[in-house]
Amino acid sequence: TVTGRFSMSNPNLQQIPSRGIIGKKMRELFLPEEGCVWGSFDYSQQEPRIVVHYALKLGLPGTDTLKDEFNKDDADFHQIVADMAQISRTMAKTINLGLFYGMGKIKLQNELNLTREKANALFSAYHAKVPFVRRLSQDLIEFAEEHKLLFTLEDRFCRFNKWETRNREWNNTINRYEPVPILTKEDAETAFKAELLEKFKDNVADNYMQDFDRYYKPAFTYKALNRLIQGSAADMTKKAMVDLYEQGILPQIQIHDELCL
């Protein structure tokens, strides 16, 4: 995937159902080698710990409470944040994961089933008490827009190589910006030149591309935090797979933060 996670198809063994009669019957089809048993191991709070790691590394405000707590094996990021923001754990988890995955305010509001006024009050309280999540996200968005890439925990490039126009119109009917085409760099440059030719009646300076970044920007930078989190988590899990293999243990399947042996 774009973040470095593994994906599967035909069949997708990462999404075998586990609940209900059918799910249980499907899982009974998978048998360990003779004389062996299945073992399933996953990371504890892998993605939230990555967020805290980078927030601490950058010295962002609001991380003092987390520094010691997050080294504990049984750390519960969502409960820690709930206590910091003085909200329920359910609300804290919804907001945390929403921000981690680049969810907008309106979608978060709908997920929480709140009115706009109550949602705004909740978000204000959250960001006042837990400022490092939004600050980290904003810093990463700015970095991604400037450099067109991020580096994951293992220094792997996570590129932003699609482009979109900065000129977006707000649609009051759907209460969001109008969708815009997502383009390759070549197509974005072609579109930019066509816009200039139309605007200036074919009288375009030879150095017109110097203004390209004023009108176009890398697409999906609002997901920069998600790219960093999932990309770094993928690095950690893949490294664990290699380490296990070198010790003579063969992972049978990887499901994001979980390894089945």
What residue spans do the PLM features occupy?
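Acidic, glycine-rich two-metal-ion catalytic cores of nucleic acid-processing enzymes
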Residues: 1-85, 141-258
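Phosphate-binding glycine-rich/basic clefts of nucleotide- and phosphate-handling proteins
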Residues: 119-124, 135-138
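Generic structural marker for isolated residues within well-ordered, non-membrane alpha-helices
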Residues: 78-82, 94, 105, 123
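Short Lys/Arg-enriched helix C-cap and helix-to-coil transition segments
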Residues: 131-145
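Residue-level signal for cytosolic alpha-helical hairpin/rod architecture
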Residues: 92-93, 105, 222, 256
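Amphipathic, charged-and-aliphatic alpha-helical interface segments
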Residues: 85-103, 244-247
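Catalytic palm subdomain of template-directed nucleic-acid polymerases
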Residues: 51, 104-117, 127-131, 259-261
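Short alpha-helical scaffolding segments that buttress acidic/His motifs in well-ordered protein cores
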Residues: 92-100, 122-126, 229
